[in-house]
Amino acid sequence: MANPHQIYRHDAAWDRQVFRSLATSLILHGHIKTTLDRAKRLRSVVEKIITKAKKNDLAARRQILSFLYAQKTKAGIKVMPYLFNKVAPRYQERNGGYTRIVRIPSRLGDNSKMAIIELV
């Protein structure tokens, strides 16, 4: 039987790139629509990032910067200041559970299970 926890058959670099992109988008936009399996894996990535951001020290900033894409959105919002000034203070009193996964109907093309992952 195949390993049920091994979701993707790609190499580690591909996984890292996809989850860097998804995590950056989730932090900037507050919610994204993706497949259910990706949402479940993304949850642990984002929870660790927000927990590190709550510390708000130089080491935490460098660790997060090494993972997230330091990009601007079309509205001109940068990821790092937004994470440390808006997102992390919102969860200062919360001990985990920063994200919510909501299942939505399957995708029409290939019937993949879809979900919306959002920051609580």
UniProtKB/Swiss-Prot annotation:
Belongs to the bacterial ribosomal protein bL17 family. Keywords: Ribonucleoprotein, Ribosomal protein. Transmembrane segments: none annotated. Part of the 50S ribosomal subunit. Contacts protein L32. One of its GO terms (biological process) is translation. GO terms for molecular function: structural constituent of ribosome. InterPro entries: Ribosomal_bL17, Ribosomal_bL17_CS, Ribosomal_bL17_sf. The gene is rplQ. GO terms for cellular component: cytosolic large ribosomal subunit. Pfam families: Ribosomal_L17. Disulfide bonds: none annotated. HAMAP family: Ribosomal_bL17 (MF_01368). This is Large ribosomal subunit protein bL17.
